[in-house]
Design a protein with these regions (language model features):
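Predominantly a Rossmann-like dinucleotide-binding segment in NAD(P)-dependent oxidoreductases
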Residues: 1-71, 101-105, 246-248
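Charged, glycine/proline-rich intrinsically disordered loops and linkers
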Residues: 11-20, 130-168, 192-219
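Active-site rim elements
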Residues: 30-37, 63-68, 92-94, 163-174, ...
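A structural signal for well-ordered alpha-helical segments within the folded catalytic domains
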Residues: 34-37, 41-48, 74, 174-181, ...
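Acidic/polar loop patches that form or flank catalytic/metal-binding clefts of enzymes
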Residues: 53-61, 88-92, 113-116, 193-196, ...
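NAD(P)-dinucleotide binding in Rossmann-like oxidoreductases
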Residues: 69, 82-179
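C-terminal helix-rich "cap/oligomerization" subdomain common to oxidoreductases
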Residues: 182-259
Length: 259
């Protein structure tokens, strides 16, 4: 389950009606991908990566409840994605309330994992098998549930203590820094692999080179590429189409392919 709750109009001020129309293109349903396309695309990409699957269908609903100012894009949307194997993603977004902000929740039979504000917690079921490391992990209370902080190096740093949010260090690196680092590392390793291959084997053997690079690709630093971006875009646009028509849309596998 994913959500984006933020009370804001999405409308920008402009000196003339013409300029207002230009800067507020996101409010025009004819050209805007809507909340699910503008905001939800990043969260949908996360689920596609987590499941390692593409959605097969999406059902959408939308309405204008808060900002009835002439816009045609809904300010409240819900989209339910269907994935192979009976998996579902429920995505909701609103511009009418900021309560509970933005989060990503993955529900499993042994635990649930919540991601928000670049932090993560695991909520174990009572009958879940013990993993061992979580016994000494930092824990935080969420209403009636206890969340085990998921952070590298924090399973033994403060044994059996409950940390306050302010006491848990935030990651100093931005998402952009991680993305650029991954790009540089992967690009260098790819180029080095080609040099190694051409120095040891016949460079005209493209099939062997492809197999070699496919093996090297398995060791890449996690980073999204054009294919992941394209797939997330397709899913988000299909969801916006479903929201606009309050309908269920089947997503054919062919739409995720290029060429």
């Amino acid at each position: 389950r994913q959500q984006y709750h933020k009370k804001q109009s999405w409308r920008a001020a402009a000196p003339t009606p013409e300029r207002q129309k230009e800067v507020n293109w996101r409010l025009d349903q004819a050209i805007s991908p809507g909340l699910v396309g503008e905001i939800g695309i990043h969260q949908i990409d996360l689920v596609n990566w987590f499941f390692m699957l593409r959605p097969t269908a999406v059902t959408g609903f939308g309405s204008l409840r808060q900002w009835r100012d002439g816009r045609t894009v809904p300010d409240n949307v819900v989209a339910i994605f269907e994935y192979p194997g009976g998996l579902f993603l429920t995505y909701e977004a609103t511009l009418g309330s900021s309560f509970d902000g933005e989060l990503n929740l993955f529900f499993g039979s042994d635990c649930a994992v919540m991601l928000r504000d670049r932090r993560a917690w695991m909520f174990q079921e009572i009958d879940a098998p013990q993993l061992g490391w979580e016994i000494n992990a930092i824990k935080e209370q969420f209403y009636k549930s206890t969340g085990i902080v998921l952070a590298a190096g924090y399973s033994k740093a403060m044994p059996n203590q409950t940390a306050k949010p302010a006491e848990v260090p935030q990651d100093p690196k931005s998402p952009l820094q991680y993305a650029l680092e991954a790009f540089v590392i992967n690009s260098y390793n790819h180029q080095a692999a080609i040099r190694d291959f051409t120095s040891a084997y016949d460079p005209s053997d493209t099939n062997a080179l492809k197999q070699y690079l496919d093996e090297i690709a398995k060791m890449r630093v996690p980073a999204p590429g054009w294919a992941e971006g394209y797939e997330a875009t397709v899913a988000a646009l299909k969801a916006n189409q479903a929201v606009a028509g309050n309908q269920r849309i089947t997503i054919e596998p062919a739409v995720f392919e290029l060429g």
